[in-house]
Amino acid sequence: MRDLLKIHKLEQKEQDFDAIRVGLASPEKIRSWSYGEVKKPETINYRTFKPEREGLFCAKVFGPMKDFECLCGKYKRMKFRNVVCEKCGVEVTYSKVRRERMGHIELAAPVAHIWYLKSLPSRLGLLMDMTLKDIERVLYFEAFLVTDPGSTPLVHKQLLTEEMYFDALDEYGDDEFEAKMGAEAIQDVLSDMKLEVEAANLREDSLNTKSQTKLKKYNKRLKLVNSLIQSGNKPEWMVLKVLPILPSDLRPLVPLDGGRFATSDLNDLYRRVINRNNRLARLLELDAPEIIVRNEKRMLQEAVDSLIDNGRRGRAVMGNNRRPLKSISDMIKGKQGRFRQNLLGKRVDYSGRSVIVCGPYLKLHQCGLPKKMALELFKPFIYNRLQTKGLASTIKAAKKMVESESPEVWDILERVVHQHPVLLNRAPTLHRLGIQAFEPLLIEGKAIQLHPLVCGAFNADFDGDQMAVHVPLSEEAQLEARTLMLASNNVLHLASGEPIIVPSQDVILGLYYMTREMINQKGEGLIFVNATEALNAYESDSVTLHAKVKLRIQDYHKVNGKFEPSAKRIVDTTVGRAIFSRILPNGLSFNLINEAISKKVVSNLIHVCYRTQELKQTVMFADQMMYMGFQYSTKSGISFCSNDMIIPDSKAKMIEQAEIQVKDIQEQFSKGVVTDGERYNKVIDIWSRTSEKVAKAMMDEIGFENFTDVDGKIQKLASFNSVYMMADSGARGSPAQMRQLSGMRGLMAKPDGSIIETPITSNFREGLNNMQYFISTHGARKGLADTALKTANSGYLTRRLVDVGQDLVITENDCGTDNGLIMKAVIDGGNIVQTLGTATLGRVTAEDVLMPDSIEIFLEKGHLVSLDDSDKINELGIESIKVRSSITCDTRYGVCSSCYGNDMARGHKIGVGEAIGVIAAQSIGEPGTQLTMRTFHIGGAASASTAVSSINVNTDGIAHFENLKSITNENNDLVVISRSSEVTIRNNKGQEVERYKIPYGAIVHVQEGGAVTAKDKISDWDPHTHPIISEQAGRVIFVDFVEGMTVNKNTDPLTGLTFFEMIDEAERSTAAKGLKPLIKMVEENDSEVVLSTHYLPSTVKINLDDNQVIAAGGVLAKIPKDLSKTSDITGGLPRVADLFEARKAKDHSILAEATGVISFGNSTKSKDRLIITSSEGKATEMMIHKWSQINVFDGETIEKGDVISDGPSNPHDILRLLGVEALANYVVREVQNVYRLQGVNISDKHIEVIVKQMLRKVEILDAGDSSFVNGETAEYGRVIEMNYQLEAQGKDLINYQRLLMGITKASLATESFISAASFQETTRVLTEASTTGRVDTLQGLKENVIVGRLIPAGTGFKHHQVRRAQYVESITTQTVDAQQALSDQLKEAEEQT
């Protein structure tokens, strides 16, 4: 019996491999795979259900139908193993060989492989240097191809129509030249091709050509020819002589009841090929007329095309149900294809699924598992235990016992389940916290009980969500689940490093309620010796929960890592807070909880606890908080009632005033004073402001109540209104929702995003009228539609991110680089959004950090910034710190842990083997889905940002300007004429506390270095228009202003002023098409001296007259701004996708290509010529479209990379002109802006990791002495490595420039073709990989999952290291043995001589 088992083991031996190579298969190779030729199109005999001999399911070719039994039944059982039956020809072996044995068809005529023909760029076309159209004409028998011109004037590879061919035959005779049709002709040309000669010719041609187009073409061909030479692929193998046939069990034929069969589409496609092939062979035998043979050959070509890739050329072959048949290509591509359906994701056979309910008494690491479910899931363990206990003699008996559910089974189940972790998973699993391990507690009922605190990580709620349970079977799996995945070990969020097990909703409400204070309560003023005494007093009804009392508390301080008691002190507090302090861990200050505990406070508490105590304390504290929160929220009796929604009395008056203002503006519009756009904008502004006012009045009314104190005085304190408490505590609802309940709903958006100018003045408590209800439906529906669409978009973004980052793993401790990124505090307007301390927390310094204004070192180079350091950085007011970053890491494969810094989810330096690429992708993608789902929470209420028209500072300080260019106007104010100016306010320590952007045309009321005080207005501007400012005093001359043709003259009825409006170019008459209206500024006294010219866009308004004199800083024209649209997250998700795809915006900004002085050259019809002359006299020309507004003027000095014309930034330009660091800062800043807008906190690290992957490629500018071709793209790491080698050999180095690739492109351009093929464009990737003979070294995670090995990350990282070490050791041993044997032989030979 043992030996038999050994035989089974031998059959399943797998070979170890380190790489996979893909290439073209030669006819010999295909025949070597095959176990026999398939000659007939028959499948199986419908009576006997046995496969037909030499048919598509032939047992002789593909193997036996049943294990160890030949087809005719002569040989059965194991003893005839590997015997070939002489009667039916079937080998006696396992039936599973039918899944791996291939067959083949000998084709009667060669056939071109459609992938190499039609997959762009066409490899055949490129190699033969012919157009795809021409090759197709030859292949499908429409034209002849000259394969050997002989001595005739015909040219090699010339195309001849039938007429031309016969003419040539008549003229030269058929012995003089050779011309063929079909794949045969192509094959002849390819087999005659001498690749080395071709490569040499191409190199010579590319050196001799001046044409860029030709050079590109030569380089493309040279690359293909070189790759064919290197890979050993022969070009003629792109044409098939032998067609391989898939093993029969991979294209099954299943008999259904009623004598019908279900079959794989491939069988139909193979049948067509075999039928046509047999017919062609017969025709050739019979020597049929050429035209019939040709037609049959064409049909064979088409049949093979549709087998390999149906529908790629011509119409797809349909099945009998009128849908295209699924070809081999369709089998592997797309979501249902082999890669994504079966290799990257598989269904699990050991799992359960049920609804989840709340388990408020569970500990954090526990879950409640229904007994019924546990019994099914733990069956193998129960059987085993029953047998070892001797309760059941066989598995069968054990099975019976379990089925009958006898009492001892339940006892054994208890024992089996004890401390055996199970995995819980909630779909969609957006990040790794979507699967966590818990210890099961057996419960009655059929629902899984889940700990409320892990709901945040799973994004679960108890409104009918379902979860799946998986059982880790092996001991290694159990160990990993317990140490790495247990819920109590995953306390921090991997995106931001903040606690994720934060209590919410009821728990927060309970804690908030118990820690609120109230005056004039029973027991006010009592003094308690400790918290227990306070609890006893509360439970004996001597004091109320909110009474103000005094409490003696014990403080702790840290000694040798332990908290020891220190002084005692008395604090003013409330009874509730005293009770809460009983669960506070030693070492957490009472001051942290001596306030009404809202969600923010709880979050901070857990954070501080995690940082100061160990993990276990934190988890226990969170659990205790939860139990207490539930207890007191029950006692509070807080409910939701319509009387709690108090409508402010002043509301009616506010709305009345707003209506009067709107009426005024309407009148101004009807008189023609303002344009419709301006009217609309102003109306929106009025209603937005009113909405805010009503909301404020409502919050004042709901948020405060009058209470009488002990002395009988009335005091205004925070109210105990239920709705207010829910929102204020952060338990549920928000001020935005409260304003809709009892303020006014405000402005609504149309489905296209524009705001409807009639707001909803009612709220939900008053109720909506028909019209208002109808307007509301827009928002509600748009919310739902958006959610559905954006969820898909967000999922796709995550998928692309995972794909680009999947092979990035921490591979070493320190790469030793000095490079890094410079971090600064992020300041937006008057708020510090992110302090420098927070930004650098958990990062490693790249150079010494000095104390401000001294040379004393504060942090040494290579120091990991801790929490204490981070606080100190903020205190000291350090401006900027250079930290290590994964973008600048020098590790060849992966990233080193010093460049990455802290592991966000663990709070210590990241370990080797962590898959940081996938973590980054999940961290960025997960909130994407959250954001998309957030749209309908405010019910579509359009929160239109009221137009900002001035800068008012919040703090006292000194004003400093950056990039400010200005001119002084008549009133001695500064008028800003630069586009990227900013003003910063620094406090008395010199720390930057506020930063504002100043738009072009703004008026500034403070000088550089001037002192400002809080509330000062330092700048203002018109928010509704873009002005064009005159930079010198002078006279205005209008050019091409022709009334009725290029401009219209209008009069403002209110002011009586006239103004010009442009007529859009599209609407002008033919006569006016050539006219270009512009304003010239000339010297006041001399019209010949032109100071400047201003081209005008079509939407402009001009309030000047011709020849008018204007002062410097005057407004020449105004361009009205667009109507205000709601800023929904629509800006968000597509914006993030655009940034990561590195898309160029349509009208992107134009940056200066060099540093120097600007001048303007001769412009062309549509473009201006801008010349930058450097100090060395080198001129750089830039051509800029006339419609782009150029922000620079003649004679101005400009730096390389400065903005010349406004617009969204182009990341490719930033990389090219300003470098990698500038690009990294730009992408990080822009992505963070989107997420910050939604209040999502993501660490910069994750974005940097993705940017690193986008910068993987370089373009070779000069290949030096390397094997690269100029203009080729190559992997950055490979080029650096090669440069080291070239430098060591004293050869010419490679000159390159970094390329920025979008994530999709970067995923497809990865070194691993398996990973790229499983992502997108499968056929294109595989075609390219096979022609170039690509080798996949299986570095990334995806490739390893696909080939079924442990991933080289986490615990698998060590496994692969050990495997490689063993491999190297075995090779070394073999080498040493061989050397020893050789030296022994030599010795022997010497001795003999």
Swiss-Prot record:
GO molecular function: DNA binding; DNA-directed RNA polymerase activity; magnesium ion binding; zinc ion binding
Pfam families to which the protein is assigned, alphabetical: RNA_pol_Rpb1_1, RNA_pol_Rpb1_2, RNA_pol_Rpb1_3, RNA_pol_Rpb1_4, RNA_pol_Rpb1_5
Cited SMART domains: RPOLA_N
Gene Ontology cellular-component terms listed: DNA-directed RNA polymerase complex
EC number: 2.7.7.6
UniProt keyword list: DNA-directed RNA polymerase, Magnesium, Metal-binding, Nucleotidyltransferase, Transcription, Transferase, Zinc
Binding residues for Mg(2+): D461, D463, D465
Binding site for Zn(2+) 2: C815, C889, C896, C899
Cofactor note: Binds 1 Mg(2+) ion per subunit. Binds 2 Zn(2+) ions per subunit.
One BP annotation, GO: DNA-templated transcription
CDD domains: RNAP_beta'_C, RNAP_beta'_N
Reaction catalysis annotation: RNA(n) + a ribonucleoside 5'-triphosphate = RNA(n+1) + diphosphate
Binding site for Zn(2+) 1: C70, C72, C85, C88
Domain of life of the source: Bacteria
Protein's job: DNA-dependent RNA polymerase catalyzes the transcription of DNA into RNA using the four ribonucleoside triphosphates as substrates.
Protein family membership: Belongs to the RNA polymerase beta' chain family.
Subunit structure comment from the entry: The RNAP catalytic core consists of 2 alpha, 1 beta, 1 beta' and 1 omega subunit. When a sigma factor is associated with the core the holoenzyme is formed, which can initiate transcription.
Protein name per Swiss-Prot or TrEMBL: DNA-directed RNA polymerase subunit beta'
Organism expressing this protein natively: Vesicomyosocius okutanii subsp. Calyptogena okutanii (strain HA)
Upper lineage: Bacteria, Pseudomonadati, Pseudomonadota, Gammaproteobacteria, Candidatus Pseudothioglobaceae
Gene: rpoC
